[in-house]
């Protein structure tokens, strides 16, 4: 009985729902008859009634299809896959490590250009950087990596720099091997209107070092994203960043700025057409112009005249130098020249380029230097940058300068960074870590063959919270035969060995006569080692295996110092381990008449060189001197038997970007020639001084700029020459010098 009631109740409910459904449909049809309205086909987008009040920025069909005149993501992916068939390449699958495990090590070979080959200015600079690097080889059998002689920088078919038939030509290379162990440099790919990443030839298994690289097509751990740079970008050296001249206050006159082209149609126009929305003419200046290209007047809109007029009111360089943040939107391609300009100016880049694989993203932590925005959230950018604190602003700006100086200021640095990244992948067991790449002085100046431990370098003591060791090794450069126990070198040995910080003494014997027996040397409380210098002046800076301490005291055989002077200089060096600390100063200057650099030993109010005849420095600079500097500079030093100390100062100043440190008041640090017999000391020869003038100009030419920095301060001991008891002074002997 109860079951029957349940079924009856269920049936009644079902009937009610059916009647309600039909009643609702009847009401809708009656309303249509009364209002004379017909049923409409459902639309995916609303049909606004107030169309006159809403300007059409895009057609409704474009919105339904995803917007933009370019191909769909699927079409772009298919086009990429058809050209780059090895899209899954990784170092383990598409690179022959066996070519790099030979005795030659990591060597790079450049294919010789064919007769009459057209090479653009930018690609010529790249080839020059490779050929002048320490990795270049002219023998392809020694090569680990290959670089094409064919210009592949500009693959826009409408460009005058476009080189046709690349695919056929590279397949004719006997060493091409489907691109394995090759690196291809490219700045521009694709052409109007879609600017796809089509290079016009199959790169195969080659590593692609490309600007404006899309994350969809980037092969992680294999390809390398490089910055877009102009043909005017300097070959080497390059200008320093501008933060040193404009560091305080952290916030500048303008909060955010952009000044550039506005694309009226085509890819990249969506973002740049919307930039005027954030312009307020006060602390945010966003200026665009339609006046570019041949047909801009055909496509100009109602806003062009006003934008062009506003565009002329502001100077780009003034905005760049006086803005805290710089907007870096995408152009036709993902990369932009604005990126490097912002880095140099210490104007924090605010990126609006969705899908852009940032330059050298494998090793650079870009969140420490840029603000990444979203093209779809342009209106949120002002509030985002306003929320960045002052301490964060200063940190970001400082990091822009670190990255600019280390990797982007010249074509040389861009190319060498590319090669060093590949080298780290090949020799991963001795590769650099992220701190080495992102902290001063940068990865190019940290050679992992020296050590993989941060504590072994002079740059990371503050990062690690430690101090250098309490011992040093003295290296004495000897060029005169030992004929008397009263020679200056005998006195010097006694003075140095009395220092409680001296671990050992190494005599680098560069005399024509063979070194004397051990019994001829005076007894000392520290180990004494005599090493053959092979009669090469540059050998005093070779990385001798016997040097185990971090600090090296470099001395000439005729140097005159007190033990207390050595101890004080060593204490000062422990506070400046990345610089040269010592006694004899020299200086450089620019001669406007000769239009060349000059060198002077006069006592002036400033100095830029500390001679290594009496100076402390870190032993890592021996490794840099031998493995970073080109052999041509070391050969120049050996040929002239001169300038090795100037070259070491150039090297250390280029690494530290700081001047050396002069200690105490001593000016004369050598025995006078009359006390050494009839033979005149080399430094007393006028020809010796002339050679040093020439060396300064030769070295600055190789570095591409003048790395030496002037300083006007000297460090003396506390209580130096104060009217207090000598018993309270630790270095009282320094006052009698």
From Swiss-Prot:
* This protein's pathway: Protein modification; protein glycosylation
**Keyword line:** Disulfide bond, Endoplasmic reticulum, Glycoprotein, Glycosyltransferase, Manganese, Membrane, Metal-binding, Signal-anchor, Transferase, Transmembrane, Transmembrane helix
> Does the record bear Oxidoreductase in its keywords?
no
Q: Which GO terms describe its biological process?
A: heparan sulfate proteoglycan biosynthetic process; protein glycosylation
Class in the EC hierarchy, top level: transferase
Tell me the membrane topology, using the record's own terms: Single-pass type II membrane protein
Sequence positions that bind Mn(2+): 558
Q: What is its EC number?
A: 2.4.1.224, 2.4.1.225
User: Which chemical reaction does it catalyze?
Assistant: 3-O-{[(1->4)-beta-D-GlcA-(1->4)-alpha-D-GlcNAc](n)-(1->4)-beta-D-GlcA-(1->3)-beta-D-Gal-(1->3)-beta-D-Gal-(1->4)-beta-D-Xyl}-L-seryl-[protein] + UDP-N-acetyl-alpha-D-glucosamine = 3-O-{alpha-D-GlcNAc-[(1->4)-beta-D-GlcA-(1->4)-alpha-D-GlcNAc](n)-(1->4)-beta-D-GlcA-(1->3)-beta-D-Gal-(1->3)-beta-D-Gal-(1->4)-beta-D-Xyl}-L-seryl-[protein] + UDP + H(+); 3-O-{alpha-D-GlcNAc-[(1->4)-beta-D-GlcA-(1->4)-alpha-D-GlcNAc](n)-(1->4)-beta-D-GlcA-(1->3)-beta-D-Gal-(1->3)-beta-D-Gal-(1->4)-beta-D-Xyl}-L-seryl-[protein] + UDP-alpha-D-glucuronate = 3-O-{[(1->4)-beta-D-GlcA-(1->4)-alpha-D-GlcNAc](n+1)-(1->4)-beta-D-GlcA-(1->3)-beta-D-Gal-(1->3)-beta-D-Gal-(1->4)-beta-D-Xyl}-L-seryl-[protein] + UDP + H(+)
UniProt cross-references to SUPFAM superfamilies, sorted A to Z:
Nucleotide-diphospho-sugar transferases (SSF53448)
Disulfide connectivity for this sequence is: 643-695
Ranges per topology, Cytoplasmic: 1-6
Task: List the cofactors.
Answer: Mn(2+)
- Give the location in the cell: Endoplasmic reticulum membrane
Q: Which InterPro entries match?
A: Exostosin, Exostosin_GT47, GT64_dom, Nucleotide-diphossugar_trans
Q: Where does UDP-N-acetyl-alpha-D-glucosamine bind?
A: 432, 540, 556-558, 644-645, 692
Molecular function terms from GO: acetylglucosaminyltransferase activity; glucuronosyl-N-acetylglucosaminyl-proteoglycan 4-alpha-N-acetylglucosaminyltransferase activity; glucuronosyltransferase activity; metal ion binding; N-acetylglucosaminyl-proteoglycan 4-beta-glucuronosyltransferase activity
Give the positions the UniProt entry annotates as the active site.
645
Residue numbers on the Lumenal membrane side: 28-737
In which broad location class does this protein mainly occur, judging by the first location in its UniProt entry?
A: endoplasmic reticulum
Q: Please report which protein family the annotation says this sequence is part of.
A: Belongs to the glycosyltransferase 47 family.
What the protein does? Glycosyltransferase required for the biosynthesis of heparan-sulfate.
What name does the UniProt record give this protein? Answer: Exostosin-1c
The organism is Danio rerio (Zebrafish)
Task: Point out the gene that encodes the protein.
Answer: ext1c
């Amino acid at each position: 009985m109860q079951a029957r009631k349940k079924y009856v109740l269920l049936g009644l409910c079902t009937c009610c729902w059916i009647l309600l459904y039909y009643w609702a449909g009847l009401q809708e049809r009656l309303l249509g008859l009364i209002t004379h309205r017909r049923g409409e086909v459902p639309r995916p987008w609303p049909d606004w009634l107030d169309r006159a009040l809403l300007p059409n920025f895009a057609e409704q069909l474009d919105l339904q299809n995803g917007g933009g005149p370019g191909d769909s993501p699927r079409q772009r992916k298919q086009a990429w896959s058809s050209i780059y068939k090895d899209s899954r390449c990784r170092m383990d699958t598409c690179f022959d490590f066996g070519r790099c495990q030979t005795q030659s090590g990591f060597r790079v070979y450049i294919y010789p250009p064919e007769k009459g080959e057209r090479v653009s200015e930018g690609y010529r600079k790249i080839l020059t950087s490779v050929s002048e690097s320490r990795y270049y080889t002219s023998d392809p059998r020694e090569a680990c990596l290959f670089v094409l002689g064919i210009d592949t920088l500009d693959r826009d078919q409408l460009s005058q720099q476009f080189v046709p038939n690349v695919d056929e030509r590279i397949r004719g290379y006997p060493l091409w091997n489907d691109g394995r162990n090759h690196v291809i440099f490219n700045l521009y790919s694709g052409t109007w209107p879609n600017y796809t990443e089509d290079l016009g030839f199959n790169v195969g298994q080659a590593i692609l070092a490309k600007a404006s690289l899309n994350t969809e097509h980037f092969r992680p751990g294999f390809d390398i994203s490089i910055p877009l740079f102009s043909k005017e970008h300097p070959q080497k050296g390059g200008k320093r960043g501008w933060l040193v001249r404009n560091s305080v206050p952290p916030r500048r006159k303008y909060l955010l700025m952009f000044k550039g082209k506005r694309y009226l149609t085509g890819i990249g126009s969506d973002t740049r057409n919307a930039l005027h929305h954030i312009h307020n003419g006060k602390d945010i200046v966003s200026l665009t112009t339609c006046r570019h290209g041949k047909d801009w007047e055909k496509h100009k809109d109602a806003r062009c005249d006003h934008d062009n007029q506003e565009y002329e009111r502001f100077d780009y360089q003034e905005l760049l130098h006086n803005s805290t943040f710089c907007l870096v939107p995408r152009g036709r391609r993902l990369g932009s020249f604005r990126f490097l300009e912002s880095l140099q100016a210490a104007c924090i880049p605010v990126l609006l380029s969705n899908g852009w694989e940032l330059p050298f993203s494998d090793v650079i932590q870009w969140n420490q230097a840029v603000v990444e925005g979203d093209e779809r959230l342009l209106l949120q950018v002002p509030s985002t940058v306003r929320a960045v604190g002052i301490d964060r602003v200063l940190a970001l700006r400082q990091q822009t300068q670190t990255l600019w100086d280390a990797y982007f200021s010249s074509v040389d640095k861009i190319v060498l960074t590319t090669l060093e990244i590949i080298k780290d992948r090949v020799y991963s067991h001795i590769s650099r870590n992220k701190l080495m790449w992102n902290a001063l002085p940068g990865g190019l100046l940290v050679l992992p063959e020296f050590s993989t431990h941060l504590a072994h370098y002079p740059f990371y003591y503050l990062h690690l919270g430690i101090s250098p060791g309490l011992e040093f090794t003295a290296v004495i450069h000897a060029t005169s035969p030992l004929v008397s126990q009263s020679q200056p070198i005998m006195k010097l040995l006694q003075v140095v060995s009395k220092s409680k910080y001296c671990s050992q003494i190494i005599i680098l014997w560069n005399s024509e006569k063979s070194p004397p027996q051990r019994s001829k040397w005076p007894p000392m409380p520290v180990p004494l080692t005599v090493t053959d210098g092979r009669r090469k002046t540059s050998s005093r800076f070779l990385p001798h295996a016997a040097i185990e301490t971090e600090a090296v005291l470099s001395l000439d055989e005729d140097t005159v110092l007190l033990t207390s002077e050595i101890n004080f200089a060593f204490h000062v060096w422990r506070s400046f381990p990345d610089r040269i600390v010592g006694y004899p100063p020299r200086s450089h200057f620019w001669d406007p008449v000769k239009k060349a650099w000059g060198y002077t030993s006069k006592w002036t109010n400033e100095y830029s060189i500390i001679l290594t005849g009496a100076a402390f420095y870190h032993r890592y600079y021996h490794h840099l001197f031998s493995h970073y500097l080109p052999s041509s500079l070391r050969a120049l030093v050996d040929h002239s038997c001169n300038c090795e100390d100037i070259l070491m100062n150039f090297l250390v100043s280029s690494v530290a970007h700081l001047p050396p440190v002069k200690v105490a008041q001593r000016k004369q640090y050598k025995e006078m020639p009359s006390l050494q017999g009839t033979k005149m000391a080399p430094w007393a020869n006028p020809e010796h001084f002339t050679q040093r003038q020439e060396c300064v100009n030769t070295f600055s030419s190789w570095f591409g700029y003048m790395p030496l920095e002037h300083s006007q301060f000297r460090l003396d001991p506390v209580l130096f020459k104060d009217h207090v008891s000598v018993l309270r002074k630790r270095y009282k002997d320094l006052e009698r010098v």
